[in-house]
Swiss-Prot record:
Listed name of the protein: Ribosomal protein uS12 methylthiotransferase RimO
Keywords: 4Fe-4S, Cytoplasm, Iron, Iron-sulfur, Metal-binding, S-adenosyl-L-methionine, Transferase
Organism, scientific name: Vibrio cholerae serotype O1 (strain ATCC 39315 / El Tor Inaba N16961)
GO CC, any one term: cytosol
Single GO BP term: tRNA modification
Length: 470
């Protein structure tokens, strides 16, 4: 969808508990080394889950899909906003009820007392990206197998929870910013960039495994390398600077889709746009602007030059006319006046962004914004949210109408008896729009096909394959 509210994503190795328990045989046997796993929250958390699962699999643990068969269940939590915290606590509770042996990790794990107050019987709790600590807890309650039948079965690119044709590529951990609505730095720490050679190596393994799209993620993607003072690294024996432009250039050599997410609007982002115009990376930029009122941006501790940003967007589009810009915004931030909100709407109409997510401000325990006076009533937040959505829906619908009659390359995500569903370069998985190909049942996920766009609504496209141009 183009306009959205926040709902924590859930990726799990487990089937729905009630269905699974009902179907289990009373004679099921456990061997002491079977692990169930639930991953909540953002793609960055998903990558952490993949790393943990890869290590567990390498050590010989079996990953299973039912609470009943699991010797231990790991829940990788999200703690970004209150709804995410509640989702995490509910999931921990479900795992305790259905299995009883639960290890908790992730962002909410940084607030152990809060978890223990609700669920005192969890076996162990660790914070985010504490991979080794998670493994130590697993070793304590589900000892490593003496015989490892899976060593040769773990793929070079590790265990992935995404479909085979796309993968998230995390380039750094933590964040140096101190936005007043966010507590991520207190949970994940300051920016730590991965070595460029390590990133390129992982990307190559993913490509060799059949991945057609890399989604580059971090807390602050455009800050990549700041902590190393943009030192010189090496990838495949060649020198490469630790900065987002150089990294993007290297990734762009692989001949697959490269999509940049969570890009903070630093001045040097301007240097990436020519790479998009040249086709080295997808002309898609995910920049969380958050607001447009200078007063609100100052309270958020975000960049406050909204007019300057409009000028940059205009320049970007001149350099790369196909550029798609996705962003997220917060309405109902403490102290936001009707005048501030109107500035946001006017800016949105001027910016004509392609994909937009909207969140009603939600207090986060420990966030500095909670101390700001003039907290906004819930009914006012809802009203502003709906008005914001209407404006962006009109913008999105008009933009997609212009796609009708054009031919676009589409990456197929899924196929069923009704047809295929895919995405264009303008659409990231899970958060953006889709392309529906009715009746096209002979395609496979991961295929790239040329599609003539025939219909559009506010968010999605419909079309037919251009068979003689594939």
């Amino acid at each position: 969808m183009t306009v959205q509210t926040f709902t924590p994503n859930q990726t799990t190795t487990l089937e729905t508990a009630k269905k699974t328990i009902a179907e289990q045989s009373q004679n099921s046997q456990t061997t002491g080394n079977k692990i169930g796993f639930v991953s909540l929250g953002c793609p960055k958390n998903l990558v952490d889950s993949e790393r943990i699962l890869t290590q567990l699999r390498t050590e010989g643990y079996e990953i299973v899909n039912s609470y009943h068969d699991s010797d231990v269940v790991i829940v990788n939590t999200c703690g970004f906003i209150d709804s995410a915290v509640q989702e995490s606590l509910d999931t921990i509770g479900e795992a305790l009820k259905e299995n009883g042996k639960v290890i908790v990790t992730g962002c909410l794990g940084a607030r152990e007392d809060e978890i223990r107050q609700v669920h005192p019987n969890v076996l162990g709790i660790t914070g985010p990206h504490a991979y080794q600590n998670v493994l130590e807890h697993v070793h304590q309650y589900a000892p490593k197998p003496a015989h490892n039948p899976f060593t040769s079965l773990v793929p070079d690119h590790g265990v992935k929870l995404t479909p085979k044709h796309y993968a998230y590529l995390k380039i750094s951990e933590g964040c140096n910013h101190r936005c007043t609505f966010c507590i991520i730095p207190s949970m994940r720490g300051d920016l730590v960039s991965r070595p460029v050679g390590e990133i390129i190596g992982e990307a190559e393994r993913l490509k060799n495994a059949g991945v057609k799209e890399l989604l580059v993620i971090s807390q602050d993607t455009s800050a990549y390398g700041v902590d190393t003072k943009h030192s010189l690294g090496f990838a495949n024996g060649s020198p490469v600077r630790h900065n987002i432009k150089a990294l993007s250039e290297e990734l762009g050599k692989m001949g697959i889709w490269v999509r940049l997410h969570y890009v903070y609007p630093y001045p040097h982002v301007d240097e990436i746009i020519p790479l998009m115009a040249e086709g080295k990376v997808l002309p898609y930029l995910d920049i969380p602007f958050q607001h447009a009122s200078p007063r609100v941006l100052k309270m958020m501790k975000r960049p406050g030059q909204a007019e300057r940003t409009l000028e940059r967007i205009k320049k970007w589009r001149e350099i790369c006319p196909e550029l798609v810009i996705r962003s997220t915004f917060i309405v109902g931030f403490p102290g936001e006046t009707e005048e501030d909100f109107q500035i946001l709407l006017d800016w949105l109409k001027e910016a004509q962004l392609d994909r937009v997510g909207c969140f009603k401000y939600s207090p986060v325990e420990g966030a500095a914004a909670n101390e700001i006076e003039d907290q906004i009533p819930e009914d006012v937040k809802q009203d502003r949210f709906e008005r914001f959505m209407l404006v962006q829906q009109e913008i999105s619908a008009a933009k997609l109408q212009k796609r009708i009659g054009s031919t676009m390359q589409v990456l197929i995500d899924e196929v069923d008896e009704e047809g295929a569903i895919g995405r264009t370069y303008a659409d990231a998985p899970e958060i953006d729009g889709l392309v529906y190909l009715n009746g096209e049942t002979n395609l496979k996920p991961g295929e790239l096909v040329n599609v003539v766009i025939e219909h559009a609504d506010e968010y999605d496209l419909w079309g037919s394959i251009l068979h003689d141009a594939q």
